[in-house]
């Protein structure tokens, strides 16, 4: 019932889409493990960059394998594979974590040129919720208008976020990844988890 917090994610089909904020991949993987432990069924998705770029945070192959191991199925890595998500009603909710400024900009403009943005677009055709876990160094600069735009759209919900290093990176914002399960629970009931802006 709307307004009542769900105690479990058992049986909930969660599209979990990772984009290229590689420094937060470890947090994202930890969340996917929690979601599976809570009974959720994951539909894993990666943007082109997330699935192809190797960094000090892991090789592309390692990251793909890790997500597939947690989810128990193959990662969706192409636009063609992502397109049926909506028509087949594959997900009850879509999570983009981490969501880069590039992905946020494309979502705000309705661009669907990556598996991530196609997954969200296809999912939204069913008027089902999308949860954004923003992670970008320009959240309070160039990306601010896109974050604000998405927050004002129906069916979009944001994981609460905070400045991660206000002295050295004053424009940087990172979502509180540990709040993703709670944000999902609220979004499934049509409620934005509050407060959205957190202070560390």
Regions found by a protein language model. Give the residues of each.
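A cross-family phosphate/adenosyl-ligand binding-site feature
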Residues: 2-130, 135-200
């Amino acid at each position: 019932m709307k307004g009542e917090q769900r105690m479990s994610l058992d049986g909930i089909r969660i599209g979990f889409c990772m984009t290229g904020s590689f420094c937060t991949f470890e947090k994202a993987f930890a969340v996917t493990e929690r979601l599976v432990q809570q009974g959720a069924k994951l539909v894993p998705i990666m943007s082109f960059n997330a699935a192809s770029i190797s960094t000090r945070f892991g090789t592309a192959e390692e990251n793909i394998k890790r997500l597939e191991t947690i989810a128990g199925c193959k990662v969706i890595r192409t636009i063609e594979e992502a397109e049926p998500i909506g028509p087949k009603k594959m997900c009850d909710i879509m999570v983009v974590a981490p969501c880069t400024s590039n992905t946020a900009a494309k979502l705000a403009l309705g661009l669907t040129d990556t598996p991530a943005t196609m997954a969200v677009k296809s999912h939204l055709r069913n008027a089902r919720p999308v949860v954004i876990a923003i992670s970008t160094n320009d959240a309070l600069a160039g990306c601010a208008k896109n974050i604000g735009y998405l927050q004002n759209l129906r069916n979009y919900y944001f994981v609460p976020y905070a400045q991660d290093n206000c002295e050295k990176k004053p424009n940087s914002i990172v979502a509180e990844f540990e709040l993703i399960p709670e944000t999902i629970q609220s979004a499934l009931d049509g409620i934005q988890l509050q407060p959205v802006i957190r202070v560390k």
